């Protein structure tokens, strides 16, 4: 009788664990190196309620997004898809530039104009809404320091505003982390010429991402 009780307890525990695993929401994050930086922290923060994945590699600009979005999302039946494009789109590059990534805002050519960025983003959202039933969340593009070699500081504001209009058109939620990213970058940025963050910076960004996602994971 004693062994039967033990077996029943173990069975209930196993059922409970399996149920918890099945109840976890599938979250897919799409983005560039900024999201690659904070995704491990988001994964840890949400480990009890969500299974978090990131698109393979760097999502780069909206052109890359258009080419790959269907392949990326077909890998799973996602509950939530969080996405961002922006920093690569507004970047100026020149083939002769010696700066990493051939960035050059003085002599280079912008990757995607504001108009083309908005158009590409509109097409991507249309694909997402057509191909998946996932809840969609757009995260705004983060801060660009003044001395960044290939990007103008004010362009981020313009591109974010354009993105918000597209999201409003499609009734997509927006997690606007731009203002927070400024404060975080000033303390934990990699420099006045670098859009990236230290480990502590990515952890701070992840807190704002996690907080928003928790309200949507039900």
Where on the chain are the PLM-derived regions?
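Serine-esterase "nucleophile elbow" of acetyl-processing enzymes
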Residues: 20-81, 203-204
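Alpha-helical cap/lid subdomain in secreted, periplasmic
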Residues: 22-23, 64-218
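Bacterial Sec-dependent N-terminal signal peptides
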Residues: 1-24
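Serine/threonine-rich low-complexity intrinsically disordered regions
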Residues: 1-7, 42, 48-49, 94, ...
């Amino acid at each position: 009788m004693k062994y039967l009780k033990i077996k029943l307890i173990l069975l209930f525990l196993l059922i409970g664990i399996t149920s918890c695993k099945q109840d976890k929401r599938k979250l897919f994050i799409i983005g560039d190196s900024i999201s690659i930086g904070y995704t491990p922290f988001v994964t840890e923060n949400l480990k009890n309620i969500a299974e978090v994945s990131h698109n393979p590699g760097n999502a780069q600009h909206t052109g890359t997004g258009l080419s790959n979005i269907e392949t990326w999302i077909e890998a799973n039946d996602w509950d939530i898809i969080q996405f961002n494009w922006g920093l690569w789109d507004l970047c100026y590059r020149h083939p002769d530039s010696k700066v990493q990534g051939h960035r050059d805002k003085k002599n280079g050519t912008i990757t995607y104009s504001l108009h083309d960025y908005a158009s590409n983003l509109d097409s991507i959202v249309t694909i997402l809404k057509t191909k998946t039933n996932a809840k969609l969340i757009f995260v705004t593009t983060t801060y660009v320091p003044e001395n960044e070699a290939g990007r103008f500081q004010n362009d981020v504001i313009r591109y974010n505003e354009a993105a918000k209009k597209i999201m409003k058109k499609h009734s997509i939620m927006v997690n606007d982390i731009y203002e927070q990213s400024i404060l975080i970058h000033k303390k934990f940025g990699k420099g006045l010429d670098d859009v990236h963050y230290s480990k502590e910076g990515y952890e701070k960004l992840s807190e704002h991402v996690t907080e928003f996602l928790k309200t949507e994971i039900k």
